[in-house]
Amino acid sequence: MSVTQKKTEISTTTTYEGESRPSSGMSGFSYSAKIHPRTSGYINRSSQSPFRSSMGSNAAYTRSYDFSYGATAMPGRYANISSTGVNHVKANREREKQDMRDLNERFANYIEKVRFLEAQNKKLAGELEELKSKWGKETSAIKEMYETELEEARKLIDATNKEKITLDVRVTELIDQLERQQKDLEESRTYHQIDQEQIARQNQQLADLEGEISMLRRSIESLEKEKMRQSNILAKMNDEMEKMRMDLNNETINHLDAENRRQTLEEELEFQKDVHAQELKELAALAYRDTTAENREFWRNELAQAIRDIQQEYDAKCDQMRGDIEAYYNLKVQEFRTGATKQNMEVTRNKEENTKLKSNMTEIRNRLADLEARNAQLERTNQDLLRDLEEKDRQNELESCQYKEEITKLRGEMESILKELQDLMDIKLSLELEIAAYRKLLEGEESRVGMKQIVEQVVGARPNEAEVLSTILTRSEGGYEATGGITTTTTTSSQERRSMSEEKKSMGSSD
């Protein structure tokens, strides 16, 4: 009676390729399942039990299990996940699902094979009972051996169930982690969309700020042109003011000269009136007095003395008038110099203001470079610049108004001076008319023979003076003919002329 030996070997190996190699016949099976990159754990189990045949020989029953599991280190931040990374995660998830399905299928195959082994064990147990009934002790030994191996198989099943539970928990954790990753991915996409919108807004804001900077630069250029134009206008106005001041000075000098001539003519007129009145009185006195040689000599000396006194008084008055005119002219010159000093001060002030404006423009240009880097403060700085520019415009307008007012004032003063000059010319013309009237009157009286004799007697040994007097009268006649129109003056003095003619007739009869 022969005894056959049986050896059953169960080997489980997990590999990445997912290959499954079933056992040949009914003696063993093997499968493999591995999910990369989960390599954090590795289990290797093996068991071996002796097998005693009914013939007393030993047989080895070996079981070997290799399991590997794990998970890769998940990243802590998902802010920079790109579409490629997302696709990679999706591909890994699909691959993991496929691996899990393969693992479940293989695990089902494994359970079926375990059941098959249990059925085979039952069959073997039946055969063992049959053998026990046949061989006795050998069957009991085989029974013990199979019971031991069955116990180990039960332990192996329990361990496999525990590992299955662990794997189920791990799968649940992985699913939860995957859901969290999907949620984080959605949040990352939302943040990415928000960042894109913010970048677009910032680009638009940057473009607007660059446009405002360009507009400010153009405004500054236009303000510089306006400043140059205002400077040119100011220079022209200063030139016009200089010309007007020169014209005013010339007109003032002419006015002073005319005033001087007027006063000189008035005083000369007064002097001539006094001389003629004195002569008339002396002539009247001589007409009623003794005409001896001694009296004539006495009166000649008195007349010469009176003429000298009058000449001295006239010279004194001329000197006084000259001093007053010089003082007045010096005062006016001092006033003009003071005005020129004020004008120079105004020009200096304008230059300082221009320098300040240039420095302000330089500061503005320097600030523009900072404003390009500080877009957040650009609006406030632009408002400050606009306020400064408006203030400068107001200052320029005020200065222009002041210059216009000064020009209007100077024009009014010049018109008043011209009016005064015209009045002086009218007064001078009237004085010349009056002087010509008096000369004509004297000429009419001189044409009489008695008047000539009286003059010759008064003048005596001074024929040159008589010639001078006649020359003056001739000139006065020419001036009268040039001016003309003295009918009223001669008419008003007709009674005086009749009285003078009667006196001359009486003097001629007495001679």
Curated annotation (Swiss-Prot):
Residues 483-492 have a biased composition (Low complexity). InterPro entries: IF_conserved (IPR018039), IF_rod_dom (IPR039008), Intermed_filament_ifa/ifb (IPR016451). The keyword Coiled coil applies. Residues 1-99 are annotated as: Head. Residues 1-32, 479-511 are annotated as: Disordered. Residues 304-449 are annotated as: Coil 2. PROSITE patterns: IF_ROD_1 (PS00226), IF_ROD_2 (PS51842). Residues 285-303 are annotated as: Linker 12. GO terms for cellular component: intermediate filament; nuclear envelope; nuclear lamina. Pfam families: Filament (PF00038). Residues 136-145 are annotated as: Linker 1. Residues 96-449 form the IF rod domain. Keywords: Coiled coil, Intermediate filament. GO terms for biological process: heterochromatin formation; nuclear envelope organization; nuclear migration; nuclear pore localization; protein localization to nuclear envelope. Belongs to the intermediate filament family. Major squid neurofilament protein. PANTHER family: INTERMEDIATE FILAMENT PROTEIN IFA-1, LAMIN DM0-RELATED. This is 60 kDa neurofilament protein. It comes from Doryteuthis pealeii.
